Amino acid sequence: MNATVSSAVQSSLPFSGKTAQVDEGTVKPLPRSQKTYLSGSRPDIRVPMREISQSDTPASMGAEKNPPIYVYDTSGPYTDPAIKIDIRAGLAPLREKWIDERGDTEILSGPASIYGRQRLNDPRLAELRFDLKRSPRRARAGANVTQMHYARGGIVTPEMEFIAIRENQRCEHLADQQREMLARQHPGQDFGAFLPRHITPEFVRDEVARGRAIIPANINHPESEPMIIGRNFLVKINANIGNSALSSSIQEEVEKMTWAIRWGGDTVMDLSTGKNIHETREWIIRNSPVPIGTVPIYQALEKVNGKAEDLTWEIFRDTLIEQAEQGVDYFTIHAGVRLAYVPMTAKRLTGIVSRGGSIMAKWCLAHHKESFLYTQFEEICEIMKAYDVSFSLGDGLRPGSIYDANDEAQFAELKTLGELTQIAWKHDVQVMIEGPGHVPMHLIKENMDMQLKYCAEAPFYTLGPLTTDIAPGYDHITSAIGAAMIGWYGTAMLCYVTPKEHLGLPDKDDVKDGIITYKIAAHAADLAKGHPGAQLRDNALSKARFEFRWEDQFNLGLDPDKARQFHDETLPQEGAKLAHFCSMCGPHFCSMKITQDVRDFAASKGVSDQEALEKGMEEKASEFVARGTEIYSKV
């Protein structure tokens, strides 16, 4: 049975932890790709990359070798045939030894969260529960276990070294002659970013210490492969998944996560609002090699049966501890929604569109006081630094239409987020700032400028922004336009939008569409910034295209499967993959074939391409004169 059918059948059955299986479609390597590992200063620092092999270029004096291309790989062990994936056991705890060596954590006897203990002791959940063999960790009394705390203390952690190797993408492997051509790129406009040609572990440490970058790495998520979010690094993308009261199962959400990381999701947010949120999240975290984020207020709201006014600090606090003990790497917390800002949204066309923002606005109005997220922020910081959970300070008042873009409410909240950032940094807690939303192109840069001004260069993390509101069903495109622009201006991570945005819960196919669309936006931003090495893959693919190496064209692309499918729809024969044309122009009108013909002619005459063109024109002119200079010939 193929993977798609197997997955569909499994999703229709009641979920059982005893029979859960990985989606077979996520565990095979991409075409002509293999997992390769680069070693660090210690044996257990093994940094994964995807090596894409290329075929040789035919040449008159023999084949010209084309080097393998190395690309950033978010798929974890799933695409490594040497590793057997069993989602019932979860992934290996990659960072566990590093965490243990630091000696600043303690292993608890069980969950400290009241709700966590209730779920663990409920016999009705036995079939759903992930069978975790270890207890949660927490910082020892008086200790701070954040990567920012280590960085500010001058410590370069194994996580930081891992990231430095990963960000460099092994660009130095090219031979001098290859480097001259493949590594050539246009100078970028970086808008004040600092992009070193080679990233060192010390540079990573310094950026984290300054608050310009974060390493989301909860001590209870040792399965994660270290990554970094900051404007002086590669632009990252996030994929949202999660069930709802109407749709989806634990199996489907785990499959969405593994599908998202296969195609390039750097982080995943579980935004579940349906049944068994706790158990769903546990399965996702235990099987995720990328950081996992959540919006804790969603689950807290479920605990009070959906009544925002019944929320309390005690319920929210326990939810934070519950999720931190599971291993959530970053929390979206809408602490910037203040009572005084709610009336500012009254004149909006679309009001408050953030779920978290609307929940807290309703609570503020019901109690006519500041939210507990704002008043208890210092205590939230104490929880965050005990587990190294990063803040993703939520933009609860983001604009939900271009009509409302860049208004008073949006920027009032942003200013408050900057103030909260300073409080978090006082505790050495890592912070990134969430941004809009719906913003027309000419207003996008102001968002980046204001964020840098108010938030002291803390990483910006934006949803798009969507640049127009006229395309339901295509909002992955309307938002990718804005995402590419704001990524260029300095946004560190882009939250993907799928074609289902505003319309329904995305399935696996929608997740892939959103990921690929946002990989394009992030890469376009890296190119525009002039990120060192960003253009290498473009150059390699362009060379393959010009040389009619069809398989290399497919495999160097973001989605080899779709590229091959589109080519084969019109030219399915295997021989067509050796042809010097495609179905777009046919054999006689292919511009690249014509150019190659000119070069072949030049080589045969021993002249340059320009001389060949001139010589060819002279020959045709002589032929025209010899035939009697008649414009039209009788046939």
From Swiss-Prot:
It is an enzyme of class 4 (lyase). InterPro entries: ThiC, ThiC-associated_dom, ThiC/Bza_core_dom, ThiC/BzaA/B. Binds 1 [4Fe-4S] cluster per subunit. The cluster is coordinated with 3 cysteines and an exchangeable S-adenosyl-L-methionine. Substrate binds at residues 240, 269, 298, 334, 354-356, 395-398, 434, 461. One of its GO terms (cellular component) is cytosol. Residues 1-14 have a biased composition (Polar residues). Its cofactor is [4Fe-4S] cluster. Residues 1-41 are annotated as: Disordered. Zn(2+) binds at residues 438, 502. [4Fe-4S] cluster binds at residues 582, 585, 590. Its EC number is 4.1.99.17. Homodimer. Belongs to the ThiC family. NCBIfam families: PRK09284.1 (NF006763), PRK13352.1 (NF009895), thiC (TIGR00190). This is Phosphomethylpyrimidine synthase. The lineage of its organism: Bacteria, Pseudomonadati, Pseudomonadota, Betaproteobacteria, Nitrosomonadales.
